[in-house]
Amino acid sequence: MEIINGPVLPRYAAPATGALTSDAKISGQLLRRVHLRRRACGLQGDHYRAARRFFGFPSERHARSGWVWPVYCSYGSSSDGDGAAAADYDASGEEFVNSSVMEAVELRSVSDGFVIKMRDGKNLRCVQNNPRVLRLRDSAPHHAIVLKMEDGSDLLLPIIVMETPSIMLLAALRNIRIPRPTIYNVVKEMTERMGYAVRLVRITEMVHDAYYSRLYLAKIGNEEETISLDLKPSDAINIAFRCKVPIQVNRRIAYNNGLKVVQPTPSESYVSSDQFQYTRLDRPDDQPCFEAQEFDLVRNMLVAAVEERYKDAAQYRDQLFMFRAKKKNMI
């Protein structure tokens, strides 16, 4: 047997396709910070596992769940689609308008426009601001996060999302405490321990009926060192609300896809991204508030699941299914 002197160089086996690499690019520097500072930041147990699910390697996420959640990181030299540097969030501020989060539950299309159902049962009847833009042709209700423009136009921008991000945002709006940390709390704590702070969230563009958003981070003590992340709007808005930073919308998107309220209501229910105050609506007189009951069931189910009380969560789930079936028969 012969002995070969010299260093052993491991051979890297490239994946069969480059789809995962191109579909889920993530900054190497940010990954190194996450792994090298794991112990220094104290990200152990549930916090670390949640962080891995959020910033995990594409192959790992793909193998476990069958889908990839792309997280794109860019630094000062990148572009966010409008020609301005992605991390320089002050460069194109005139193209964006501040917005506030409303306590909306779902969006439904009707024959003469749209209906936004609020958390406490109020219905806002709306029409499209730009009639030439066609969208949401089906009449089925969709869970939605609704942003209100703060430029005096009072336009509403509904963003259709999954049920969980919508419920998590409503829980944050109502200051409902969840015992176990959510992924949004983990991201907030992780960025702070890494020396960064969330500064801004922007809804930048709409491509094939899907909104794109960016989350802007700045180095604490050095505002010129910035990072921008491409996230789903539902996640970016949840993080922005918990970090108490402005949520801005591209003016073109707000004009083309925004809705105008045509039915006046006694009062409005929204949370300002600057002042974070809200006006609580009165419940309908002598009428059951089905939305509030449904919200309580969903909240109890999620809290039980987070606390690993799976038997209780299953009971709340069955109650929720029965409640929704009963409400559907009443319509």
Curated annotation (Swiss-Prot):
SUPFAM superfamilies in alphabetical order: Hypothetical protein TM0160
GO cellular component: nucleus; VCB complex
Gene Ontology MF: a single term: nuclease activity
Residue intervals passing through the bilayer: none
Domain BFN: from-to ranges: 126-261
Record-stated family: Belongs to the bifunctional nuclease family.
The name this protein goes by in its record: Bifunctional nuclease
Naturally occurring in which organism (per UniProt): Oryza minuta
Source organism phylogeny: Eukaryota, Viridiplantae, Streptophyta, Embryophyta, Tracheophyta
